[in-house]
Amino acid sequence: MTILGIDPGTRKMGYALISLEKGKIALIEAGLIKIKAEELQFQIPQMVEAFEGIFKNHKIDEVAIEDIFYAHNPKTTIKLAQFRGAIMLMLIQQFGQFSEYTALQVKKALTGNGKATKEQVAFMAKRLLNIKKEIKPLDITDAIAVAITHSQRVRLKQQ
């Protein structure tokens, strides 16, 4: 089974594809989608095009996305919500469904602590996947963590 994890953002989005076979997880691919356009009306199609490339190149069985958080700037929160709405529509059209996890759920799933730092989550994501090299930026490890969190839920359902 291939799981796509997404860490949404307004300028850059982390994504990660992991495989789940016989209870074991492995990283297939992870990366960053950079949004270069300045206006929302051009940013969203740019993001959709990037994801369509990922969908074409991989057989994806399950998708998980990190839920929205409240930013200190209301404009940023609104823009992130608009991007998530576009992503959600795209995922429903492509896969029929997707799962959502809050940052707290992801942190707890990987570290056991809902107040873990991004660096602690990144450390555990790399450890669980036996990755030795550094992965930057943290948007990528956040997406990996979302995918791992979903893999844990899938494993529980299979038992």
Swiss-Prot record:
GO cellular component, one term: Holliday junction resolvase complex
InterPro entries registered for this protein in UniProt: RNaseH-like_sf, RNaseH_sf, X-over_junc_endoDNase_Mg_BS, X-over_junc_endoDNase_RuvC
Enzyme class: hydrolase
UniProt: Mg(2+) 2 binding residues: 66
Domain of life: Bacteria
Annotated keywords: Cytoplasm, DNA damage, DNA recombination, DNA repair, DNA-binding, Endonuclease, Hydrolase, Magnesium, Metal-binding, Nuclease
EC number: 3.1.21.10
Essential cofactor(s): Mg(2+)
Cofactor note: Binds 2 Mg(2+) ion per subunit.
Catalytic activity: Endonucleolytic cleavage at a junction such as a reciprocal single-stranded crossover between two homologous DNA duplexes (Holliday junction)
Enzyme active site: 7, 66, 139
GO MF annotations in UniProt: crossover junction DNA endonuclease activity; DNA binding; magnesium ion binding
CDD domains given in the database record: RuvC
Binding locations of Mg(2+) 1: 7, 139
GO biological process annotation, one example: DNA recombination
Subcellular location: Cytoplasm
Job of this protein: The RuvA-RuvB-RuvC complex processes Holliday junction (HJ) DNA during genetic recombination and DNA repair. Endonuclease that resolves HJ intermediates. Cleaves cruciform DNA by making single-stranded nicks across the HJ at symmetrical positions within the homologous arms, yielding a 5'-phosphate and a 3'-hydroxyl group; requires a central core of homology in the junction. The consensus cleavage sequence is 5'-(A/T)TT(C/G)-3'. Cleavage occurs on the 3'-side of the TT dinucleotide at the point of strand exchange.
Subunit note: Homodimer which binds Holliday junction (HJ) DNA. The HJ becomes 2-fold symmetrical on binding to RuvC with unstacked arms; it has a different conformation from HJ DNA in complex with RuvA. In the full resolvosome a probable DNA-RuvA(4)-RuvB(12)-RuvC(2) complex forms which resolves the HJ.
Similarity-based family: Belongs to the RuvC family.
Xref: HAMAP family: RuvC
Annotated protein name in UniProt: Crossover junction endodeoxyribonuclease RuvC
